[in-house]
Amino acid sequence: MPLENFGSVLNFAEELETQDQLFYATVAANPACAEHKELFEQFAADAKKNIKTAQRTRRENVTEMILEPIKDFVRAPFCEECAGADSMSAEDALATARRLQERAVNYYTRAAEKIKALPEVSRALKTMGKKHNVQREKLAVL
């Protein structure tokens, strides 16, 4: 499904963050992942903040929206299933978390490029991408 405008880019960002929040909250409660519970709880809290950031960005910039469509940007490369988080081993949960962080960094980087016409929105997307990059680096050392 194509991401054709400002609203669809931010709506999809909100969907990704909601999926991430659910995944991290679920693996934080998974006894097999107890060793990384604090990290996953922090990631869930960060995802919740990112949802609010996406919503606020959409709300504050809707009047500046440019109707020019976004081209060549689709959801497919950023869709990832996270089923079974409640029964994953710690190793599988960390591997999935790494994939989710990589996906988020890629999405926010590409989205910021595609929405350059709205500098405030592009900046917000870049900032969210940087936050995910920090999380990705935390996961890389585990």
Predicted feature locations:
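The feature marks the first
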Residues: 1-26, 30-31
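Amphipathic alpha-helical coiled-coil segments and their boundaries
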Residues: 3-6, 10, 40, 87-90, ...
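Acidic/histidine-rich alpha-helical segments that form the ligand environment
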Residues: 13, 20, 26-27, 77-116
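Alpha-helical transition-metal enzyme core signature, strongest for iron centers
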Residues: 13-24, 40-58, 101-104, 125-139
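Short loop-to-helix capping motifs
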Residues: 33-34, 117-118
